């Protein structure tokens, strides 16, 4: 299968084209939309794809593999948060090996720590992403089923490594012309830790609001793998209707969208909310009745709606797991537990990155990328 790059720190990006590309001269650095890409001589013929908060993505011709690739130019070193996300993504993707998770083919950077201003991450080139695809067409049930299977197949691997993606959304699902799908953008990923404290009621959370599980907004600790399943449920609903199911404008609006469809939580579900302020807020709201999925999606496959219901369950303890979702009747034609690999061992971060200064994070990025430098020993 093929793989690719998404615009760092952002969603879709602009359509691919030759605008802003300066023709290459041997020995010179190519410039894309004013940005120098110091990636020669192996990578040439750059074309702009898109850009995000702290970098730009271009396609390029790889003279070794004889194919076009995607190159992310990341310039994160002025900001602790960008350094943190860059390091986390590199750490995870260099250790992951799965057909439905984006891989890293190569990393280019300056030969010394002092000279390192940018990092170039080379990945397989994908033609589009699910966000762009849903903007342009209504998917058939067959396509929805196949894309959902691949999302869950990749997520099974991620979760088996004890990692939460935490930012699953259509623009982070890359797709090529043969409908292969790869999950990308692991900058917000974390080790699954149900006991880690996430302080505060309705404090700002970095992942895209529309795909956030309700417990993220309501609890101060207890994030589990079920938050990713909620996001996949939101993505399935969006594939069925070509519009986001919970497009909240802010926190409380987001909760109101969710409760407006799922109905008021039961007393048992309220009991799983450990934050008393949040629980009291929910109990103060007028009672709401659940809306039938078939009413929202009258033309959709009934098995798809049953799986959707099991994913978009308010109580994370009752939400379907990724293994259970793969075995659901809706995905029967693809389900093959012998071809749904898991990680060889749980992923562990050597240290908590949140508290490290950007200078230390830069050193760690330099170390993590050393294996790609000329003369470095082959990676295992």
Curated annotation (Swiss-Prot):
The record's EC number reads 2.7.11.24
- Where does this protein hold ATP? 49-57, 72
Q: How is it modified after translation?
A: Phosphorylated upon FLT3 and KIT signaling. Ligand-activated ALK induces tyrosine phosphorylation. Dephosphorylated by PTPRJ at Tyr-205. Dually phosphorylated on Thr-203 and Tyr-205, which activates the enzyme.
Sites of the modification Phosphotyrosine?
A: 205
Domains (record comment): The TXY motif contains the threonine and tyrosine residues whose phosphorylation activates the MAP kinases.
UniProt subunit comment: Binds both upstream activators and downstream substrates in multimolecular complexes. Found in a complex with at least BRAF, HRAS, MAP2K1/MEK1, MAPK3 and RGS14. Interacts with ADAM15, ARRB2, CANX, DAPK1 (via death domain), HSF4, IER3, MAP2K1/MEK1, MORG1, NISCH, PEA15, SGK1 and MKNK2. MKNK2 isoform 1 binding prevents from dephosphorylation and inactivation. Interacts with TPR. Interacts with HSF1 (via D domain and preferentially with hyperphosphorylated form); this interaction occurs upon heat shock. Interacts with CDKN2AIP. Interacts with CAVIN4.
Name of the protein described by the UniProt record: Mitogen-activated protein kinase 3
Organism, by scientific name, is: Rattus norvegicus
- Per UniProt, what is the name of the gene that codes for the protein in this document? Mapk3
């Amino acid at each position: 299968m093929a793989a690719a790059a998404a615009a760092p720190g952002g969603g879709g990006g602009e359509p691919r084209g030759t605008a802003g590309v300066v023709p290459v001269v041997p020995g010179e650095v190519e410039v894309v939309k004013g940005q120098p890409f110091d990636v020669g001589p192996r990578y040439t013929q750059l074309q702009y794809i898109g850009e995000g908060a702290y970098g730009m993505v271009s396609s390029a011709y790889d003279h070794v593999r004889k194919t076009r690739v995607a190159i992310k130019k990341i310039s994160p070193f002025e900001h602790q948060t960008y350094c943190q996300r860059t390091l986390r993504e590199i750490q995870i993707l260099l250790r992951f090996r799965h057909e439905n998770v984006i891989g890293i083919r190569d990393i280019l950077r300056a030969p010394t720590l002092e000279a390192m201003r940018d990092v170039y991450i080379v990945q397989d080139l994908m033609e589009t992403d699910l966000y762009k695809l849903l903007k342009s067409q209504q998917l058939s049930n067959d396509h929805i089923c196949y894309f959902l299977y691949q999302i869950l197949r990749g997520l099974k691997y991620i979760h088996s490594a004890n990692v939460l993606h935490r930012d699953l959304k259509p623009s982070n699902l890359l797709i090529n012309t043969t409908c292969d799908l790869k999950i990308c953008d692991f900058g917000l990923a974390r080790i699954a830790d149900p006991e880690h404290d996430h302080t505060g009621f309705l404090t700002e959370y970095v992942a895209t609001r529309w795909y956030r599980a309700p417990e993220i907004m309501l609890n101060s600790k207890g994030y589990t793998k079920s938050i990713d399943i909620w996001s996949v449920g939101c993505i399935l609903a969006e594939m069925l209707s070509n519009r986001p199911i919970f497009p909240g404008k802010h926190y409380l609006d987001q909760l109101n969208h969710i409760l407006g469809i799922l109905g008021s939580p039961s007393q048992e579900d309220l009991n799983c909310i450990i934050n008393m302020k949040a629980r009291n807020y929910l109990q103060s709201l007028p009672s709401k009745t659940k809306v039938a999925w078939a009413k929202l999606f009258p033309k959709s496959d009934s098995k798809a709606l049953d799986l959707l219901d099991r994913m978009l369950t308010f109580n994370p303890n009752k939400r379907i797991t990724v293994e259970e979702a793969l075995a659901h009747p809706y995905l029967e034609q693809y389900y093959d537990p012998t071809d749904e690999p898991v990680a060889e061992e749980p992923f562990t971060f050597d240290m908590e990155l949140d508290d490290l200064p950007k200078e230390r994070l830069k050193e760690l990025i330099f170390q993590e990328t050393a294996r790609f430098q000329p003369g470095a020993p082959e990676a295992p």
